[in-house]
Amino acid sequence: MNHLQQRQLFLENLLVGVNNMFHQMQKRPVNTCCRSLQKILDHLILLQTIHSPAFRLDQMQLRQMQTLACLWIHQYNHDHQVTLGAIKWISPLIKELK
């Protein structure tokens, strides 16, 4: 398996794991999902430092993961303040949710 195939497999597995966790948001409190998401994001950051360049996600891909997380939280939580707090926790660069 060449580097491009390995990278594609890695990204697909990562997306499946993140997507599976978000589907559980209907069954679990938002705070639990936020903690799980934070672990995933921490793991992504760790992978950035230990993997060869073929496996590293670029800034755009990391940002897409954060955006996906924020969209899922917003979709499954109807309390605006809790949603905003969760999103700020995951992605501190987001100033406000409109």
Swiss-Prot record:
Domain of life: Viruses
Localization terms from the record: Host cytoplasm; Host mitochondrion
Subunit structure: Interacts with NSP2 and NSP5.
Name assigned to this protein: Non-structural protein 6
Keyword field: Host cytoplasm, Host mitochondrion
InterPro entries linked to this entry: Rotavirus_NSP6
Family according to the record: Belongs to the rotavirus A NSP6 family.
A Pfam family it matches: Rota_NS6
Disulfide bonds, paired cysteine numbers: none
GO cellular component, one term: host cell mitochondrion
